[in-house]
Amino acid sequence: MSAWTHRHILDLSTFSREDYAAVLELAHRFSAMPVTGARRLPALQGRLVATLFFEPSTRTRSSFELAAKRLSADVSSFSPSSSSLSKGESLLDTARTYVAMGADVLVVRHRCTGVPRQLAEALERTGERTVVLNGGDGLHSHPSQGLLDLYTLAQHFNPSHPLPEALRGRRIVIVGDVLHSRVARSNLWALTACGADVILCGPPSLVPEAFAQFVAQPPPGQASDPVADRGALTVVRNLDDALAGADAVMTLRLQKERMRQHMLTSLDRYHRDFGLSHERLQVCQVPIPVLHPGPVNRGVEMSGALLDDLSANRVEDQVRNGIPIRMALLYLMAAAESPLSL
């Protein structure tokens, strides 16, 4: 495994192919824990992981906390409704409170883009050793979700060796609300870095044509792209055309809470044009894995029958894989010195 160089994890645009391989390899080793019966490792014993979630979350928060506990870390969970934020305390002061209590890792989720980066930069300026892991910020990024989706696909294509090479040359369709999705943005960086060609599909209001250039240049403030030869990224409007020849498809939740009024005329029409079902997938000619980062609007992004068919979709695998992926990230970030014995 190559040396880990990321002090904070804020965005997958900074990841090299070797970084993806390091995370997936470690996650694959951690995923063997339930099989061997070993429920905990002493790797992060004595470390404190604090989950600072300023947005509601079920899967991500629970997954991070379970991951930390399986590595024997102590966990402190922050809730805005019962915190001093309601008394006027700033977000930075809240974070510093956890740093003062000895937090080694802050997992931060916030509705505003850039908050995890701002906290990381503030801690760097004062020389704190605490590191920040982005648990999802605004429309910007959701690194751990992008990584677990990548791992789920690699696991499907090569169960015994689920590494980035399993994605090279694959055709992956992402359909739905790309505009409002931090998950989609993280997946675009991850999938193209591993050599997959990505086809985006949806109405122009949710998949602007400009997304075809999303990975063409590094983000502002980043000098260069750590991946020299990314996969292709294209936008296709017709879902049947997009699915023809696809190796996998991911459908995204319609984030109605982030939409302006009248962005969609009808949910029924959306499902008819862009929803997934057993019937729609027949255009693929061969079975392909169906992913969804959750939560699912049943009967909108995916038919109820397809969602209930665990042989056709990988939704539960995504949830399951969140734990070893987040264990890998916490282990790498905390620079644990305990040897692994899986």
From Swiss-Prot:
Chain positions recorded as L-aspartate binding sites: K87, R182, R253
GO BP terms, alphabetized: 'de novo' pyrimidine nucleobase biosynthetic process; 'de novo' UMP biosynthetic process; amino acid metabolic process
Top enzyme category: transferase
Record-linked InterPro entries: Asp/Orn_carbamoyltranf_P-bd, Asp/Orn_carbamoylTrfase, Asp/Orn_carbamoylTrfase_sf, Asp_carbamoyltransf, Asp_carbamoyltransf_Asp/Orn-bd
Keywords of this entry: Pyrimidine biosynthesis, Transferase
Pfam families named in the record: OTCace, OTCace_N
UniProt pathway: Pyrimidine metabolism; UMP biosynthesis via de novo pathway; (S)-dihydroorotate from bicarbonate: step 2/3
Gene Ontology MF terms in the entry: amino acid binding; aspartate carbamoyltransferase activity
Documented EC number(s): 2.1.3.2
Cellular component terms per the entry's GO annotation: cytosol
Residues spanning the signal sequence: none
Positions contributing to carbamoyl phosphate binding: R59, T60, R109, H142, Q145, G294, P295
Catalytic reactions on record: carbamoyl phosphate + L-aspartate = N-carbamoyl-L-aspartate + phosphate + H(+)
Family (UniProt): Belongs to the aspartate/ornithine carbamoyltransferase superfamily. ATCase family.
Quaternary structure, from the entry: Heterododecamer (2C3:3R2) of six catalytic PyrB chains organized as two trimers (C3), and six regulatory PyrI chains organized as three dimers (R2).
Function recorded in the entry: Catalyzes the condensation of carbamoyl phosphate and aspartate to form carbamoyl aspartate and inorganic phosphate, the committed step in the de novo pyrimidine nucleotide biosynthesis pathway.
Name of this chain's protein: Aspartate carbamoyltransferase catalytic subunit
Gene from which the chain derives: pyrB
